[in-house]
Amino acid sequence: MAKFEGYSEKQKSRQQYFVYPLLFQEYIYAFAHDYVLNGSEPVEIFGCNNKKFSSLLVKRLIIRMYQQNFWINSVNHPNQDRLLDHSNHFYSEFYSQILSEGFAIVVEIPFSLGQLSCPEEKEIPKFQNLRSIHSIFPFLEDKFLHLHYLSHIEIPYPIHFEILVQLLEYRIKDVPSLHLLRFFLNYYSNWNSLITSMKSIFLFSKENKRLSRFLYNSYVSEYEFFLLFLRKQSSCLRLTSSGTFLERIHFSRKMEHFGVMYPGFFRKTIWFFMDPLMHYVRYQRKVILASKGTLLFQKKWKSYLVNFSQYFFSFWTQPQRIRLNQLTNSCFDFLGYRSSVPINTFLVRNQMLENFFLIDTRMKKFDTTAPATPLIGSLSKAQFCTGSGHPISKPIWTDLSDWDILDRFGRICRNLFHYHSGSSKKRTLYRLKYILRLSCARTLARKHKSTVRTFMQRLGSVFLEEFFTEEEQVFSLMFAKTTHFSFHGSHSERIWYLDIIRIDDLVNPLTLN
């Protein structure tokens, strides 16, 4: 623990950023208002859905902030109407929202300045050592075949708001800003208890989206920094000859190495790689820890994680919630995929002179599939099929035009194929495609009071092209010269689209009714 504290202290920002005076500048709140208007997500604008920015109200807010008893009255009377002890609900709502958004912009400044590191600096800031979430795909493709055990951990959240403030003290040395942050958090939660209900978190996140997102990202950054430290401590030097670079895994390494030239007849270069015993990757609120060590090594890691989380984050983690799975004997779920690393056996016949040998070869293979039961359950909940997967019509869409009905069904099908394009087995996806296609045909037939066969004969190829997915177009270009290629075959090529991390449990593609 002392070693981690020393490592963390070394990575802290040494500069003193005094950002509190910026809260008294009018242009800060203009920036906050401009951010809300131009944001990618629909949010409520200042002043109870009033999209007009009032410079006069901002000036009044700054004048009130200069008063000596401004914050004292707000803290001592938290049960009065909204924030800032104002009798008018409109002014109180406006002041609360605009002050929160302005503070969120101000508190982000030390983190933005830390990213602009000087070229002569040797130490890299710790947030630049963290991995991109897109690294999960090469991690699964390149690393998993060489690992033995896996642990699926959910990042503990929510935690006490005081822990979030203490984490920000690593890079924000401005004490008044931290006190102001405590004031905001004290207003939206019970300060003397651990947050176990999501009511206060939801209220705070809804009214302070930028500030709540900043706090959560800071917390996840510290949690991942802790995993990065543990990963570095578990690394070992492994001797690797230059001849082994024929393996693909060594080409994709992004770790520091050094070469030592030994004098001799052949003058061969020997490389030393920092080979970590523990690998991790994070996505959403989950962390995957995988190791090539033994089961005893994994159990020690599990105990260490539980104790460290309790000490550093003051959060109790139940040990039974961290499950240890052997990759070759179990499946695991991530991002809506069901994955496994089975061992396939191949019988190879070799001939040496006049003798024949049968060699039993065992190879690992990384398989990803789309889980059929949850996806069919989602389609059933959206009233596209029954619980057993039998397609039915969707009466609520019969008032739409034929083109809108085709477009909606085709869009859902393309989104499903796009999200699960990384599956090595497409059987489940083609089953979902059949359900959506027949449900679309029955919906159109019900609208025109006709039979399904008659309507499909009338549409012909137009109906089929609407369900021709983007992934199949890619494969048609790849295998244009193949004569006997079928899209409904068992091809196992995977295409990972990096934008699928923005889709949460396939809710968006299915809620079109």
UniProtKB/Swiss-Prot annotation:
The keyword Chloroplast applies. GO terms for cellular component: chloroplast. GO terms for molecular function: RNA binding. One of its GO terms (biological process) is RNA splicing. Keywords: Chloroplast, mRNA processing, Plastid, RNA-binding, tRNA processing. Pfam families: Intron_maturas2 (PF01348), MatK_N (PF01824). It is found in: Plastid, Chloroplast. Its main location: plastid. The keyword Signal does not apply. Usually encoded in the trnK tRNA gene intron. Probably assists in splicing its own and other chloroplast group II introns. This is Maturase K. It comes from Astrebla lappacea. The gene is matK.
